[in-house]
Amino acid sequence: KLACRFPDFIDYVESVCNEFRELYQNIKGTTPYCIKRVAVLNSWGKMRAWGAHMVHHAIYQKQNYSYAGVIEALSGAPFDVSFISFDDIRRDSGLLKNIDVIINAGDGDTAHTGGDVWEDEVVSSATRQFVYEGGGLIGIGEPAGHQYQGHYIQLANVFGIEKETGFTLNYDKYNWEAAGGHFITEDCTKEIDFGEGKKNMYALEGATILVQKEKEVQMAVNEFGKGRSVYISGLPYSFENTRILYRSILWSTH
């Protein structure tokens, strides 16, 4: 009934559908070339594929747009994207052998990043092993964020970053210098837009800071065993941020 009041909208939908019919007719079931296999890891997996960060018909939310851009960027990229849950890893951690890069994005202690699921040694050890043996890990916001056993970022040694929650104020922190240039940021022509970003993030020894603002890390990279990780405080959708994510995936899988 609502759509009938907007005939131009109906006509446009028809034209778009016809475009897709033509595409399907021409590709004849061919799988497009994908350069890497990327898995978005959260509590829902396939249940909320492509919609994990969508709230109320994708209406803009200040708390959400810094993460929704990640899914938007992946949707048009030359990657084989899948969505896996923590329960999937519990059932069969071997599935990670068919993945090149894991992305964990969102605020800490939420279903997006896992919360107390990281207390489960099966999940945490499988993820660490994946990276140590050569996999890539990209964290956006507060990946694996949950206060437990002296850490807030439960994969702190993998990402090379930690969040100051008051428990490490008396720790000396010396790693604040940002690197001059990096493969990931080569396409950037202006200051990187981190959206809301994150406060109180600091780098651990050995990590390479790409961007920091007032001694708060916004982007960093780290090597863990044979693998690599990338940390980004937020990534709202834009052309340049799409390139950042694209190059982050390539760099993390080297």
How would you label these PLM feature ranges?
Residues N98-D100, G206-A207:
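Short, well-ordered alpha-helix to beta-strand connector turns
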Residues D100-D107, I138, S229-Y231:
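Structural motif
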Residues D109, G114-K190, N241:
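A glycine-rich, often tryptophan-bearing local segment used as a flexible ligand/cofactor-contacting loop or short
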Residues R90-K97, E119:
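Short amphipathic alpha-helix with an adjacent loop that forms part of the alpha/beta core around
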Residues G45-M47, D88-I89, G108-T110, P143-H146, ...:
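Short, solvent-exposed loop/turn segments at secondary-structure junctions
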Residues A73-S93:
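A short, well-structured beta->alpha microelement
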Residues W50, E164-R228, S233-R243, H254:
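Catalytic beta-strand/loop cores that center a nucleophilic Ser/Cys/Thr
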Residues K1-G69, F167-N170, L210-Q212, Y231-G234, ...:
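Hydrophobic targeting/anchoring helices
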